[in-house]
Amino acid sequence: NDFAQATSLLYNAPIYMDDSSGISMPEIKAKIRTINQDPKKEKIGLVIIDYLQLMTTGQRSENRVQEISSITRNLKIMAKEMNVPIIALSQLSRAVEKQGNNSSHRPQLSDLRDSGSIEQDADCVLFLYRDSYYASQNPDGAEVDADTAECIVAKNRHGETSTVPLGWDGAHTRFMDVDFKR
C-alpha cells in the first residue's frame, strides 16, 4: 500500500528533527557537528529552523531585537563555516494585517518581525501570500480565486526579485505549480 511505502521511505530517510524549545546557536552547532562526525550517518545537507523567534542566543538579553540580530548573524556564519544552506522561518509583524488601507496585504521586507537584521543577513527572502486569506477585508468586494497563491521573492542576493504564481490546495495545506492538475 502507498501509505506503508511512504512511511517506510520517510522512516529510513536521513532526516533529523529536533523539537527542543528555546534552542540556542551553540546547541544547534553542536548537534550538527555530532551528526556530521558520525560515520554511520549522512552529513547534514540542509538546516531548516521553524520559527526563528523561538531560538535564543544562549546568553541573557533584555533586548529582543539585538538577540534576533545576533541569531541571524550567527546563522549566516554557521552556514558558511559548515557549508550548509539554512532556511529560517520567521513570523511577520502585525503591520501586514493592518495594511488594508492600501488594499494590499502583500508582505514586504519591513514586515519581518523583531529585527531588520533578518533582511540584512538573509541571501534570499520569500513570502507566501494568498489573496483569499484577506478576501473578507477586500474593500471593493471583488471575487478572489481561492485556489491561487503567490511566492514573493522579496530579496535575492544572487539574482532577481519577482513574484511567482502558485496553486493552493487548502484541503491539504499545499502549495503547488499552477499547472499541476489535482
Question: What annotation goes with each model-predicted range?
Answer:
Residues 67-182:
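Phosphate-binding/switch region of NTP-binding enzymes
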Residues 1-43, 57, 163-165:
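Cytosolic-facing regulatory segments adjacent to core modules
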Residues 1, 15-22, 56-69, 96-110:
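Flexible beta-alpha connector loops of hexameric P-loop NTPases
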Residues 52:
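Conserved Walker B
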